[in-house]
Amino acid sequence: EEYKALIHAAHDRGMRVIMDSIHNHIGDQHWWMKDLPTYDWVHNIDEYMQTNYQGSAVADPYASDYDMTKLVDGWFVPEMPDLNQDQPLLTDYLIVNTIWWIEYSGVDGIRMDSYLYPDKEYMAEWVEAVLSSYLDFNIVGEAWAVNPPAAAYWQYDLPGQGDGYDSKLPSITDFPWSFAVRDGMAEEFGWQNGLMKVYYMLGQDHLYADAMKNVIFLDNHDMSRVYEHVGKDKDAFKIAITLLMTQRGIPQVYYGTEFMFGHENRGGDDEAWRQTLPGSWSDDQRTVFEASGRTDEEQEAFEFIRGLANWRKGAIATHEGTMKHFIPENGTYVYF
């Protein structure tokens, strides 16, 4: 009921809500694990096998059956039993469960976590079932892939793909874009380094069915904060934000990035990457939800991002236009 109320309150403010979902695995404390509906409800119930985390193998024309089995059937960690989407009862349950949540809550879209790990034929069936029922709905799959060819495989109707797979998926998380921009701001300019990485990466957009539907981002809960990654260089941070708000795709800002969050270790860890916003809890000493609780640097970053985001709302070219860019020279990258 609280989730439904949140969505309705967001709608009253002209906002939309994206639900985070996952069909790859459950937690080991899920009630299913106390009495599995069928013996084959999860993979490898008798003998633990861990995934290899190599999602790019799905698009690899030379991938071995051994690697594919470990990827799809292996568990993320011992606490996350891997669901078997080849089980027809589970398939039906997951599809109906999704439709129920949309009907009940009025949620506007879904971000599907760990999209590369479940059975890919099931994922295409799930996407088609949802989008054929809700024509103005959107789904973005978390496609953690290291390069554009591996990422583009997961977007709908990729022309010329050798195995003929059509994911039906409208949007993917554009990790190659994120990696290129993060490194582009952190490295010295060179033939293959710095801003050249952004240029080379965008030059592969022809591989995507529609790169404008890619979700682009600078950091997330599984990565070091972008401000930390660029060495806490404020200018580099602002350029990265500018790229986020002016290049093709759907920009996503991870909470805390609007306040230029960093952490002590550059590599960081889950606790550092997922730190709470000051003011989220009653015993916090300050709150960033009000300008009076922010530091000068946090306020500067907030105003910079808010200004660009508000400008982007009315900048039609960033939503519908075409892009033209020039080969970077002497550390300068020009695009329109």
Please name every model-derived segment.
Residues 1-105, 123-133, 138, 149-151, ...:
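Substrate-binding/active-site clefts of carbohydrate-active enzymes
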Residues 11, 25, 33-34, 97-99, ...:
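Active-site-proximal helices and loops of the catalytic beta/alpha 8
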Residues 17-20, 311-322:
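Bilobed periplasmic-binding protein-like "clamshell/Venus-flytrap" ligand-binding domains
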Residues 71-86, 104-106, 218-227, 282-291:
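Short glycine/proline-rich turn/loop motifs
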Residues 109, 225-229, 323:
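Surface-exposed cleft-lining segments at the edges of enzyme active sites
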Residues 140-141, 249-257, 316-323:
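Acidic/polar loop patches that form or flank catalytic/metal-binding clefts of enzymes
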